[in-house]
């Protein structure tokens, strides 16, 4: 199984949207059983919060399922657990 983690500052906008879009693409290709996809934050600011309403609205507008999600912070263990950890911008990469 390929394990992918998307990371942004708060885990309520970009990384969450990317997680849901990528999951939708994987599911559409019939590859759901080959991937584990998640997202996380570099900061603690939004821990426990749901996706931002703007993110949810845009996903629904595009017909992409909004999955159950609460913001989490990435950990050192994630480097061992995931095959790919993808930061959403240069600042995120520095903070990872």
Question: Which sequence ranges carry the predicted segments?
Answer:
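Helix-loop-beta element that forms the nucleotide-linked donor phosphate-binding surface
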Residues: 96
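Conserved active-site segments centered on acidic
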Residues: 1-81
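Glycine-rich, N-terminal phosphate-binding loop of Rossmann-like dinucleotide-binding domains
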Residues: 89
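Alpha-helix capping/helix-boundary segments
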Residues: 92-93
């Amino acid at each position: 199984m390929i394990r992918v983690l998307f990371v942004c500052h708060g885990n309520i906008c970009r990384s969450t949207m990317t997680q849901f879009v990528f999951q939708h693409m994987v599911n559409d290709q019939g590859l759901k059983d080959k991937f584990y996809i998640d997202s996380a934050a570099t900061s603690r600011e939004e821990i426990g919060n749901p996706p931002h309403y703007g993110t949810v609205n845009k996903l629904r507008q595009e017909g992409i399922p909004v999955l159950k999600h609460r913001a989490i912070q990435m950990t050192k263990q994630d480097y061992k657990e995931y095959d790919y950890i993808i930061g959403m911008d240069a600042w995120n990469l520095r903070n990872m």
